[in-house]
Amino acid sequence: CKSMTHIAASHGRSTVLPILAQPRVNSVAPILPAFASFSPRLHARKHPTKMPAKPPFHRRVLHWFDKHGRHDLPWQRGVTPYRVWVSEIMLQQTQVATVIPYFDRFMASFPTVKELAEASEDLVLHHWTGLGYYARARNLHAAAKTLVAEYGGIFPSTVDELASLKGIGRSTAGAIAALSMDVHAPILDGNVKRVLARHNAIAGWPEQTRVRNHLWEIATELTPADRVANYTQAMMDLGATVCTRTKPRCEVCPLADDCKARLQNLISSMPGKKPKKIIPVRETVLFIVFNDAGDVLLEKRPPSGIWGSLYSFPEGDNPKELPRLTAAVTIQAESLRTLEPLRHTFSHFHLDITPVTVQSRPTNAATEPERWLWYPLDGSIEVGLAAPVTKIIKSLSAT
C-alpha cells in the first residue's frame, strides 16, 4: 500500500503528518463471523416447542373406557338386541345396582322376546313390581308382541324402525343399535347429556328443545365410525362414574383438560336444573279387606292412570265410601280399623294414604271376578302390585 500524507496548518507553517497504511477492505463478509459471535441474539431465532396434538374426543373416551369402564354388567354378557333393550328400559330413571337383580330375574323368566310376548301382562308386571314407572313394563310387553307379529322376533337394525316400537325413543333406539349391532347411532341419555353439557358449557335444562337439539348435534358429531358399541358404553359409564351429578371426579376425567365448564368454574351449575314446580298433595283411603282365610282383596286398576293395570287395594276418598265397595263385591264389613298413614311420592304429586282394615264375612263373591282378586299375604299369586300395596302387605305379613 502506498503512504499517504495530510497537510495541516500549524502556526502558519505547513506540517506533513503521516497516516499509517491500512489494508484494503473489499467486503464486509470477513467481518461478520466476528460480529456474529459477539452478538448472537441479533441473528439467531428461537422456535417455540410444538405441543403434541391432543387426541380426538372419542379416542380419549375409549382409552379411559379400556382401563376404567364397566365390562361385567349382566347385559354385557352374551349381548343381543333383546338383552340390551330390556336393560335400557329398566335403566330409565333407575340406578344400575337396583336394576341388576330385576334384570336377572326377568331374563330367567323371559329369555327371549317370543317368551316375553307370550307371557300374560300380570306376570310381566309381577316381575316389574318395585321398579316403578310401570308404563315401561306395559310398553315393553306391547313392543315384544309387535316384534314377534311383524318382525318374526328379529330386531330391526335401523334407528327409525326401532324408535317406531312402543316405549322406544330416539336415544334408546340408538343404544340398542350401537351396543348390540355396532351401528353408528348416537345416544343422549341422562349421563351423556351431563358429560356433553359440561364439556361444551351448554347452559339450560337439557330437556328444553333448544338445549336438547344442540346436544343431539354434538352427540352425532362426536360419535365415531369405529368401536361404536364401546364408545356408547364408555360415554354412559363416564357420566355414571366420573362426571356425576354431584361431586364429579374431574381429577380422573379424560376430558378435563378442555372441559369448558371446569375451566370456567361452572361444573356445579351444569347441566341446568329443571324449573321447580310446587308438588301438590292428594289424599286417598285404601281399604284392606280381609276374608276368613286371611287373604286381602285387591282390585285391578284400569290401564291408564297411576298404577295402570296393577293390583291395588280398593280406593276411596274417605272411609264413608266403604258401602260402595261392599256393594261392588257383595261383602259385608264387620269391623274397621285405621292404620298409620303413609306418603307415596310420584314424579308430579305426593299421595297421602290412609289404610283402613276391614274384616268381611266369609260369604262373599265379586260381581266382576276378572277385576277382583283374593290375594294371599305370602305372595304366592304372581301379579303386579302397586308399590304402597307391596309395602303394606309386607308390614301385615310381619305382624
Model regions and ranges:
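Low-acidity, Ser/Thr- and Arg-rich intrinsically disordered low-complexity segments
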Residues: C1-T5, S10-S14, R24-S27
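Catalytic cores of DNA base-excision repair glycosylases
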Residues: P55-E251, L255-L266
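Intrinsically disordered, low-complexity proline-rich regions
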Residues: L20, R24, L32-A36, P40-H43
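Intrinsically disordered, low-complexity, charged terminal extensions of DNA damage-control enzymes
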Residues: F35, L42-H71, Q76-R77, D237-T399
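N-terminal low-complexity, intrinsically disordered patches enriched in charged
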Residues: S14, A21-Q22, N139, N318, ...
